[in-house]
Regions:
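Active-site hotspot residues in diverse enzymes, especially metal/ion-binding acidic/histidine motifs
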Residues: 1-145
């Protein structure tokens, strides 16, 4: 529930679950540009946080990627994952999984509004606009598994 709680606190603080609105309020520069191999990227240049989002994404994909990149700012500020991947043997996959989970929590910060008993995970995934695995992580976060 740690990541869900962080998302809920952020939504309550800014009065919205829209990640782009929150990023602008925080002072994160956002650029929407066409990219071929990336959906989005977060970086900090000269202490200025910056997010680039692939402009070729659907609205649903864009909202998820915005929340995913916001997660890197909220949860992983100061971690240079690209550097770690290229120069060390440290595994950084957990940063991406955490960012995916945070993005799902931003899409549905109040579980009672989106969870229906007995509903297949794929239905939840489709409603949130996330992959099956991310919907499973969300359920594990909500139910503490």
């Amino acid at each position: 529930m740690k990541i869900l709680k962080r998302a809920q606190n952020l939504v309550a603080q800014y009065g919205t679950s829209d990640a782009a609105t929150i990023m602008v309020s925080i002072g994160i520069e956002i650029a929407y540009i066409p990219m071929t191999n990336l959906r989005g990227i977060y970086n900090c240049i000269e202490k200025m946080p910056f997010v680039a989002i692939n402009s070729n994404l659907t609205d649903c994909e864009r909202k998820f990627v915005e929340a995913h990149e916001l997660a890197h700012y909220i949860l992983h500020r100061g971690v240079n994952r690209v550097f770690l991947n290229r120069t060390t043997y440290l595994k950084t996959d957990h940063y991406e999984r955490e960012a995916d989970l945070f993005a799902a929590c931003m899409r549905a910060p109040w579980p009672n509004d989106v969870l229906f008993e007995g509903e297949p995970v794929d239905n939840l995934a489709a409603r949130l606009g996330v992959r099956h695995e991310v919907a499973e992580m969300y359920l594990n976060e909500v139910y503490g598994k």
